[in-house]
Amino acid sequence: MERVKKEAAIVTGASSGIGYAISQKLSVLGYEVFGFGRDFEKAAWQAADNVHPIVCDVLDTNKLCTYIKQITAQHPVHILVNNAGIGYYGLHEELSPDKIKKLVRTNLETPMILTQQLLRHLKKNAGYVINISSVTANQSNPHGCAYGAAKAGLASFSHSLFDEARKYGVKVVTIFPDITQTNLYRNADFREGDEAESYLLPEDVAGAVEWILSQREGVIVTDITLKPQIHRIKRK
């Protein structure tokens, strides 16, 4: 299912993990991929001719919007993947106000701003907004209250946005991954189990994105939950 190369896909949090895997998948599918990340030096980033890493902190709204204007001036944007995320774990009273603000801005505010900046273009191109949420959006999340709340807010935004924009051909999809082998949990006191069946890989989420894009025009799956076969986590 190869797309015309000039169609653009924008992916946040693209320097590693899920965002990196999605960027590589979209590159193979023929999109002109613009991946936003804070540090591509530490990542095993493999840039093809149609993959463009952009060093930018998504919390720098002015810089982010400037890049978006430059991209949309040269390419029809077909896909936006809001993937950048950050998690802080522990008792809620032990989170600082600054950490709570950063978490909400990264996981919820920035996706809403990026979508606002690109929505007119996505309507014109009958494009996709793919939001990477979390299974914690749909369940109790003790020791991760703020993270779960922000991801639940992202899911709510997705559902309302789809109802608002569907008549223009815009597809809005939320992916809810369970524990995935990424750096997201580096601040947590737990990690995935040792068995390969106890966690997801970033490539699993990228595969879900490919499946979303493979559906015929007129069909949209709005929510996808990905879970490992075995539920097992380990304390660090």
Range-by-range predicted roles:
Residues 15-16:
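Conserved glycine-rich cofactor-binding loop
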Residues 29-45:
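Conserved glycine-rich Rossmann-like NAD(P)H-binding loop of the short-chain dehydrogenase/reductase
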